[in-house]
Design a protein with these regions (language model features):
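Active-site-adjacent helical/loop segments in soluble small-molecule enzymes
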Residues: 37-94
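Glycine-rich phosphate/pyrophosphate-binding loop at beta-loop-alpha junctions
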Residues: 1-46, 87-88, 92-93, 97-116
Length: 116
């Protein structure tokens, strides 16, 4: 979860949907609040075992690594999965890990901020 917008993560920790401030993040797909009654809240609470706080630089670095190695674009929300994997590299060593990279919806300005 981006540190700049950790509304879902903080809500999960509290066991209820919170209305807290969210700052801008490259991960616009995970940004913002969680609507009351949203089905995603219960699904996340029931299925997510571990969460990771990510700095904007970690997300952008992970996105750049993916773009360089895979020669494909990805959006910031997908970059959080790679950033979390990199951050937990030692902890996950020797384990089978799968992540889903979907979404290439990134603005030119956001892309520039990643590759510059």
């Amino acid at each position: 979860s981006p540190e700049n917008s950790a509304v879902m993560l903080r809500s999960m920790e509290a066991g209820k949907i919170l209305n807290i401030e969210s700052k801008p993040t490259i991960s616009d797909g995970t940004a913002g609040g969680v609507e009351k009654g949203a089905i995603t809240f219960d699904i996340c609470c029931d299925t997510i075992d571990q969460t990771v706080f990510l700095k904007e630089a970690e997300i952008k670095d992970a996105m750049l690594l993916y773009i360089k190695n895979e020669r494909k674009l990805l959006e910031g929300a997908a970059g959080t999965a790679i950033a979390a994997l990199i951050k937990k590299k030692k902890e996950l060593a020797g384990k089978k890990v799968g992540i889903i990279i979907c979404g290439g919806n990134i603005s030119i300005d956001d892309l520039k901020s990643v590759i510059v």
